Amino acid sequence: MAAVKKQIICINWGTKYGAPYINRLYAMCARNITGAFTMTCFTDNREGVRPEVICQDLPPSDIVMPKSKGIWPKSRLWNETLDGVEGPVLFLDLDLVITGNLDGFFDYGDPDDVILARNPTTPFEKLGQTSIFRFPVGKLAPLLEIFRADPQGIADEYTFEQRFVTRNAPGGIKFWPKPWVRHFRTQCVPLFPMNYFIAPKLPADARVVIFPATPNPPDALRGRWVPEEGDRTRGEHIMRAIRGPRHFDKRFRHLRRFLLPTPWIADHWRE
């Protein structure tokens, strides 16, 4: 049997992430992949990216991206071809944390499979999460054509690009084994009110921890939900909730969104 070609891809546009995130991602991959691998970043800014990363221009797109919660610019990766890579590729979000060996993500299932993480926030829907997913280059091209025909209509129907992939990938999708990928907000942070007393835990069998929406790894490391909140004590956070929005639901939502610092992130999310 031929050796599996280990190809990582990621995508970067705008100013939210950039070279620091790309470089950390490469370093985490290098520490957790056995043998040779490549990492290709499709980006609009190569400045500061370490030389081991193969930088390619963003795949061309003539689509006006819809107004939606979904990260629809990822659809650029559904093109029939991608510069510099072919065959199965493992896509990684720039803001995830790799905490264990990645080798299994390259040979799990069949080379032609589309494999996603499970989204634990909607357990009855069986929704996939594209924070870490594998697909053969070109297999999702039919989805790109459907999306191109009516971008806003598709976004209105599915909201998230990962729901569109889950429901429409040719041949269907598979999921990674549950223990491999953990969702920080729902599977690491203790439930309210214990999150005020217990720091987020790293499950022993987790290989990757994903950070959809908020918080981001650097904020979770410091113990805050978003940068604008600053570093608050328990008491300061509670008082902010009490003095905040008048609507009870918004106050309670703010009250629940509290984190203690998460030091294990620094152990893994580094160059």
Where on the chain are the PLM-derived regions?
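N-terminal anchoring/stem segment of glycosyltransferases
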Residues: 1-65, 82-85, 137, 257, ...
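A short, glycine-/small-residue-rich helix N-cap motif at loop->alpha-helix starts
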Residues: 62-73, 160
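Catalytic core and acceptor-binding pocket of nucleotide-sugar-dependent glycosyltransferases
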Residues: 141-271
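Short, well-ordered beta-strand micro-motif
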Residues: 79, 134-136, 210
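Conserved catalytic core of nucleotide-sugar-dependent glycosyltransferases
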Residues: 102-168
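Short N-terminal binding/cap micro-motifs at the start of the first secondary-structure element
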Residues: 16-22, 124, 217-220
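Short, polar loop motifs at secondary-structure junctions
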Residues: 40-48, 100-102, 179-180, 214-215
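GT-A fold catalytic core of metal-dependent nucleotide-sugar glycosyltransferases
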Residues: 47, 54-57, 73-127
